[in-house]
Amino acid sequence: MPEKRLTAEPPTITEEEFEDSLATDDFLVDYFNEFLSLPTFSEAIRFNADYGVFEVANDAPQFLEKQLKKILQNQQPRNPIYDVVRKGKNEVKPVQMNAPDEDETINVNYNIMCLSREEGIKWIKKERLPAFLESDCYFEYRLAKLVSQVRWSKSGMNFTVGSNFSPWIVKKPPSLPPPATEEDNLVIMKKFYVSLGEASYTQTKDWFALAKQSQQTVSTFSLPCCVPYNKLKSPAISSVSENFIFDDGVHPRTKKDPSKTNKLISEFEEEEGEEEEVSVSLQDTPSQALLRVYLEKKQDVDESLTMHFSTCEEFLSSYIYFILRGAIQQIVGKPVGETPDYINFNNITKVSFDDCFESIHGKNFLSELVQTTKERSEEIEQTSLSSKNESAGPESRADWCISHRTYDIGNRKEFERFKKFIKGTLGERYWWLWMDIERLKVLKDPGRHQRHLEKMKKCYLVSNGDYYLSAEILSKFKLLDGSQWNEEHLRNIQSEVLKPLLLYWAPRFCVTHSASTKYASAELKFWHLRQAKPRKDIDPFPQMATLLPLRPKSCIPQIPEIQKEEFSLSQPPKSPNKSPEVKTATQKPWKRELLYPGSSKDDVIEKGSKYMSESSKVIHLTSFTDISECLKPQLDRRYAYTEEPRVKTVSDVGALGGSDMENLLQSLYVENRAGFFFTKFCEHSGNKLWKNSVYFWFDLQAYHQLFYQETLQPFKVCKQAQYLFATYVAPSATLDIGLQQEKKKEIYMKIQPPFEDLFDTAEEYILLLLLEPWTKMVKSDQIAYKKVELVEETRQLDSTYFRKLQALHKETFSKKAEDTTCEIGTGILSLSNVSKRTEYWDNVPAEYKHFKFSDLLNNKLEFEHFRQFLETHSSSMDLMCWTDIEQFRRITYRDRNQRKAKSIYIKNKYLNKKYFFGPNSPASLYQQNQVMHLSGGWGKILHEQLDAPVLVEIQKHVQNRLENVWLPLFLASEQFAARQKIKVQMKDIAEELLLQKAEKKIGVWKPVESKWISSSCKIIAFRKALLNPVTSRQFQRFVALKGDLLENGLLFWQEVQKYKDLCHSHCDESVIQKKITTIINCFINSSIPPALQIDIPVEQAQKIIEHRKELGPYVFREAQMTIFGVLFKFWPQFCEFRKNLTDENIMSVLERRQEYNKQKKKLAVLEDEKSGKDGIKQYANTSVPAIKTALLSDSFLGLQPYGRQPTWCYSKYIEALEQERILLKIQEELEKKLFAGLQPLTNFKASSSTMSLKKNMSAHSSQK
């Protein structure tokens, strides 16, 4: 079984190696782009790895993509699957496909602002890199690199973790040797081991002259020695033995040519024949010492030569190349130059590799190989014809790995799948312990350092911790003793914490994505789908969430509701504004997990489905732990009777500071991902109130999360509330936030029992307080950013939709043109193959084979035809690149500014992953690496200018493809032959340039998508409004128009608030129980049907009734949160409604609307009754004569008994419900009157009361 060595030491990014790592490490690009686009920073920046430049975030590519998709949908026929109504045969019409006009052009170019390369790098290193190196983004990047080492193969893999093994060394070009610091004479003296002593100046001078003269012809050595010939390893003596013989310990040696050495040895063998041992004398040395090398008879070491390959494909490609090279050499008659990766299989007798083809019973191995080759070619074609954001999902990578019989975690999306895979397992605990150790290592402040250690103990050591580790694991890590929880010991065990992830969880993840898992039985797949898919509720009244997040996170950024359809594609220097508000969350609980659009979007969010986490635990959130651990409560059902469309309006953006406050909350939410950028600003400011307020906000979020667990723990809630009060609010608090004395007293009076709104006043106070440092930080960051020069660049969108539109456009061409295109297109798949290039020239007629590329340059007319030929086949980039470099070479050296500008232009346009370093590059991968080494390394791609030799080398590769590929295709075309016969046939076939490599699109990081999120300031404002008598009365009338039970829900919420005040008043327990009973009888278990008078799930109501005593003061917690979420949905609509009205007019307008709705319902009921009476009357008239029944139509037959069609109208149903409600209300009032009076009502009998009730009901009905 093959072995693979892994390292437990993650890569370390330094300022010196940052550029090289950013240019070569895709993981680093992903995480650094996520960091740069966080809402903490005033300007959203991203690094474009294709062009090697930092760009200002721009939504123009996504907007263009939507436009192209819309155009394509208009051009293509409608999919019949969407035709719900089945049409008759005569109604079906042939679908007409609207092909685009030939002259129609679609502009796929867009402008984007880029940071100046030199200034941008300096600004990034100064303003962003230090914070990144202390952020969770960097820690997760290091962990991702470690996990990415794991690789799965069918033949098995034995993993070993080594301490002295590091694969993270950045490849750099060989550096020049340092200049000699010693004088030449001193070096010569050391070489010859001489001391001149008291020699005269003349003698010394003559001796040095003689030594220098002898040094020019022969090599030196220290002592003569003998080396047996059989100890010399083939193919060259100079590899090991030469260093041993000639090294004098002072200066290095240069390796001799292996071919010459082999030739020398072979000559010795021929001369000596069968002698057992021979010797040969080499050249004399300056010190006149004789060197003799003793040679023994050479053994045939090639007999057992074994070559090892990592995969079977690698062996096949090498062997096929060896066979083809021999065939080409025999055909051409000339030796073909060797490449570095060439292997001579004549000397190899045995081949071994890690992975091999599995023997499949009943199938032909050759057919299987051919099928695999076809699939791979189709996959390569598909990848080259699709953008990365559409085809580079985790599934496509998984399919690629399976087709190659391997699997690894080699990109960000696979790593996100691995995170999801270990969620809820022991591997997740190892994960977060490793991350917490990383966080601990960067904390410099002693206070924060100690607090983080305490939080880690509570999380991992205490039995009720969120990530509690068993005693066996703690004993293994030597963490059972609390004194061992120190930074030094945690650093020592960090590699041991990582080993379970590398040796078990990561290989297990890879194995689950193997071919056997992919091709599992249909029954197993169906069972897994049913388990993973949430159960659909068949209840006609959908339930609301068990727990609605009143305060999920005070800072979760919103997803904008209003999407602008049109905007300028030219990006201004400033980044887009932040979203103006944050919405309220209604998603399942999740812990320590972030949602990325590029990560779990393809995995979990597909075709509009929302990501719902499976976890139900909650993380104890502090300012020194992962802020993204906040849970959100589970949504089992939605509310009933209140289904309303989402209103595209923003509510009260002025509350608590407006948009600035929302930006502050967004920043606080992602502080851990941003390296606590804002927190450090407050710490360094010297203002203790700012620093304490930030700490309080983080700890307060942890307190809020305790209310969103499935099982509320009153003891933990009480303990956390007391901790917050004692640490931040109390008069003698160590981290006092400066709250007013009245508010402190108010919090103290309500601290027993504590509810989720206990610290609302304190939270509102600190948010307003933190607005000042936030504004100062943003301004200072913008000042530094404005010093960087911005350059506008024009880009071209590479989209699948655009290619499909081009395909539709090509259908209008003639069949002959299509055949020509196909013929030429088939020969461009393998441009680097020598045999293909020979075949290109074989297709050229003999009379045109004398044409060279230089002839085209001299013939301007043919050169223009050649340019059009390349444009026709979307390959004009080669000629453009060659022309631009040629223009650069012809610029005089004196004109330095023009040469510099041209060099920068060439580098920005061609030296990127869209062209020269992409899949359609004119150079091979080895040649690309040689070019980058010549230019100084991959890190140089981030700088402005390249040297002239580099550009000349690039031009050589471009010209090589032009001469060997495109020129023979051009000469073999019919158009060229027709022009040579003076039959001019001009045909312009123009297409847009299609780049072969997809543009990397790393969108601005968004933690959540398609979720209702709301900040704490909106929740506080809404809660205040519900407690305000005037506002609550207006809102009550407003929601009464939206649903039948919404008004009751508002009253229920207010009654629960009164119950909370009653608990804080410390009154008698019997009074509190009586209040609970009253609320239950009125809203949850009413004697008047329906029993449940508010919009909460039935299970929730049953839980309140059955466990009212066990729940204690939190008996109505879940129900109140559910109602709050239902009502909060209509709060933005109400705010929009009352904007244009005065307080005096609001009630009158609402009353008129209510009256209008009633009249509308009455008219609908009357119309339904009238239509029903007419139908019955008509039926009676037509059914009297029995003879006429045969003449009745089918519609009237349907009205006969047992065949009558049931009619149902929603408006009539609503009216009936309203009537029932009124009658029940009248009955309730009468019952109150009956039991209110003593003497007068005791004489009444049941019959009389019943008669009066019926009379009143009938009277009320007649009035209606």
Swiss-Prot record:
Residues 565-587 are annotated as: Disordered. It comes from the Eukaryota. Testis-specific. Expressed in Leydig cells and spermatogenic cells from the spermatogonia to spermatid stages (at protein level). Signal peptide: none annotated. SMART domains: RGS. It is found in: Cytoplasm; Nucleus. GO terms for biological process: negative regulation of signal transduction. It holds the Pfam family RGS. PROSITE patterns: RGS (PS50132). Keywords: Coiled coil, Cytoplasm, Nucleus, Repeat, Signal transduction inhibitor. Residues 852-980, 1021-1145 form the RGS domain. InterPro entries: RGS (IPR016137), Rgs22 (IPR042651), RGS22_RGS_fourth (IPR048074), RGS22_RGS_second (IPR048075), RGS22_RGS_third (IPR048073), RGS_sf (IPR036305), RGS_subdomain_2 (IPR044926). GO terms for cellular component: actin cytoskeleton; cytoplasm; cytosol; fibrillar center; nucleus. Residues 568-578 have a biased composition (Polar residues). Residues 1142-1174 form a coiled coil. Inhibits signal transduction by increasing the GTPase activity of G protein alpha subunits thereby driving them into their inactive GDP-bound form. Interacts with GNA11, GNA12 and GNA13. This is Regulator of G-protein signaling 22. It comes from Homo sapiens (Human). The gene is RGS22.
